[in-house]
Amino acid sequence: MLIIILLLIASYLLGAIPFGLWIGKIFFKKNLHDYGSGNTGTTNTFRILGVKAGIAVFIFDLLKGTLATLLPLIFHINGVSPLIFGLLAVIGHTLSIFDHFKGGKAVATSAGVVLGFSPFFLLYLLVIFILVLWLFSMISLSSVVAAIFALLGILIFPSFGFILTSYDLLFSIIIFALAIIIIFRHKTNLKRIKNHCESLVPFGLNLSRQKEK
């Protein structure tokens, strides 16, 4: 029981590591909270610190979720779903004890959790993400739409045995929780999208005709 508690705490602490914030401060002498959206996640890192830093933060944030999800397997723990460990990593990422309980928007770390538990489901979401990104040129919208399609996937796919072969109540609950976290963390982005002033990536069709301020 003690090892389970320690690993649950470790999952939160692992997720709480603010790689974007630390990389910005150590290597670029910049506090991401003072630039762009003020967020310490992958997207703001790309915009403020550049491609190399953005890729590094994305990989680290993704692996936080994956490693936390795999902790029960690594330590041969039974009786507690790996998804619980993954969810704690996402909570750590969004409410980091190392960053005054601030954090990212949970997309990369949530993707890492899904990667550790159901890689093909993540692949399905990645296709949705890339398609929406190309059509609308917005990472925020792509993230929210992928979260919505994750909810649709857990409802529909088990009926056809496609990707998800059967209904898994806990997986459905965790996916629901992750989707809600992602959508909630993007509420300011959704307001900007509504006002046609959301930040864009430098490619894609920008079908909604956003104009960055």
From Swiss-Prot:
It is a multi-pass membrane protein. GO terms for biological process: phospholipid biosynthetic process. It catalyses: an acyl phosphate + sn-glycerol 3-phosphate = a 1-acyl-sn-glycero-3-phosphate + phosphate. GO terms for cellular component: plasma membrane. It comes from the Bacteria. InterPro entries: G3P_acylTferase_PlsY. The chain crosses the membrane at residues 3-23, 48-68, 71-91, 119-139, 144-164, 165-185. Pathway: Lipid metabolism; phospholipid metabolism. One of its GO terms (molecular function) is acyl-phosphate glycerol-3-phosphate acyltransferase activity. PANTHER family: GLYCEROL-3-PHOSPHATE ACYLTRANSFERASE-RELATED, INNER MEMBRANE PROTEIN YGIH. Probably interacts with PlsX. NCBIfam families: glycerol-3-phosphate 1-O-acyltransferase PlsY. This is Glycerol-3-phosphate acyltransferase. It comes from Lactococcus lactis subsp. cremoris (strain MG1363).
